Amino acid sequence: MPKRTSLQNMGEAGEACVRQYLEEQGWQILAQQWRCRWGELDLVASRAGELIFVEVKTRSGQGWDQKGLLAVGIQKQQRLIRAAQAFLSQHPDLAELACRFDVALVEQRPGKEGVSYALADYLQGAFELWE
């Protein structure tokens, strides 16, 4: 089995941070790191007739890409939309729910007792399905 990189570990820690946030908001997590030929859906959750596909970007500093926001450009959005369509084709019982694409930006923060992760921004409806 390949060894985990520090970037993979940081990404998973960021996803765990967002997962906890969503659960505290009453969302039920349906899938995490769901993969298909189009890519990966970091988190899929539902609540009260809504379904969200959440892309999580975790950064250790400000960086050049606005805490990860610029990493979710048009091509990434198209891959996420295709992955969401694949997810829905495998879960037809969810296909009638209102769907939304959110982006969560997580910061890695150094501290006296090691690093911690905090939700820096959560963008509901960060992009829409368009053809």
Curated annotation (Swiss-Prot):
GO terms for molecular function: nucleic acid binding. It comes from the Bacteria. InterPro entries: Restrct_endonuc-II-like (IPR011335), tRNA_endonuc-like_dom_sf (IPR011856), UPF0102_YraN-like (IPR003509). Pfam families: UPF0102. Belongs to the UPF0102 family. This is UPF0102 protein CYA_0708.
